[in-house]
């Protein structure tokens, strides 16, 4: 698990129908959230927030993360987004997030992180799958550091949040 308590406004970029954000808000009653995804996706999000009892603390915004993301958050979440894309496309997405984040904010990248060298066969299979299917890839911590640096972020911390998922905390530079 990851501690979202330090943040007052959390934007979940490409957050689907809002399951992650609804759970974050349910566990943190003082927070507000913004769910951001394509119009046809967020159109189905209302019942998720209603069921969690957090509809009054969440805005649902439709848009395109290649163009802009909602501004004013002190945390922007990207869960299992970067592994879908190649580096150049990710830099475009990350620079859009960089323009929107508060100077003291954090970008929270939730992804599987490959072990260096050739460890972890199941993660390597996931990497191959991401390459073949959508054209993306799984990355090592060092590859994430480079990708984020190219997008004007620096990695502040990496927190293991569960099996096969870590939270990469990145700060704007």
Predicted feature residues:
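Alpha-helical subdomain
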Residues: 3-173
């Amino acid at each position: 698990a990851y501690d979202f308590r330090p943040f007052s406004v959390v934007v979940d970029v490409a957050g689907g129908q809002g399951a992650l954000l609804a759970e974050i808000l349910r566990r943190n009653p003082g927070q507000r959230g913004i769910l951001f995804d394509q119009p046809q996706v967020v159109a189905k999000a209302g019942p998720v927030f209603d069921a969690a009892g957090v509809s009054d603390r969440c805005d649902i915004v439709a848009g395109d993360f290649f163009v802009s993301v909602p501004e004013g958050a002190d945390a922007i979440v990207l869960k299992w987004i970067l592994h879908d894309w190649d580096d150049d496309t990710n830099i475009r997405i990350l620079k859009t997030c960089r323009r929107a984040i508060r100077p003291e904010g954090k970008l929270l990248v939730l992804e599987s992180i490959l072990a260096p060298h050739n460890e972890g066969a199941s993660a390597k299979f996931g990497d191959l799958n991401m390459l073949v299917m959508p054209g993306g890839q799984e990355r090592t911590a060092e590859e994430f550091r480079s990708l984020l640096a190219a997008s004007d972020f620096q990695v502040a911390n990496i927190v293991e949040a569960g099996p096969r998922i870590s939270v990469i905390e990145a700060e704007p530079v």
